Amino acid sequence: MDPTDEPGVTEASARYLVAVFRLWAESGRRASTGDIADRLDVEPSSVTDMLGKLDAAGYLDHAPHRGVELTPSGTEFARALSRRQCVVEAFVDGLGTSIGAERAHAIGYRLPAAAVDRLGVESDLDCWDRCRAGEDRLDDCAKLAGVGPA
């Protein structure tokens, strides 16, 4: 899957999809506009605008005052984007340096699928072992890996 081939999804909107996906994985509930704004360090009005676009494109269901949840296609796409970011972070960490989540997302978004797969092989690390949910939330790691409920 190459995100640049996905109609209607820019690098910026992909950040929102990943944020909604990770918030759901961490909490198991719909993400609020405020949660997304905090996660991305943006204004709630910016979140509302972007969620409207992603809702219209069919990637998520945004119900004002009830939160946001990804559609099946949004979940699949966000899971793939999240994996890309994780692979880039794992590879760079393996080199003994760090680039941060924002930069890893940008690089992961732009790289061709074959390059991401190659980095995953070169990092010699199961990306999902790096789940940010913490050891007490192993079920969330399974969700991120795609083996939990979607």
Named regions from a protein language model:
Residues 51-52:
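Short, hydrophobic-biased segments on the C-terminal half of alpha helices
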Residues 1-4, 150:
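Terminal disorder- and signal-encoded targeting elements
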Residues 55-65:
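A short, conserved structural fragment
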Residues 79-101:
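Mid-chain, well-packed structural core segment of small domains
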Residues 66-85:
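Basic, amphipathic "hinge/linker" alpha-helix immediately C-terminal to the N-terminal HTH DNA-binding motif
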Residues 3-42:
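N-terminal helix-turn-helix DNA-binding core of bacterial DNA-binding proteins
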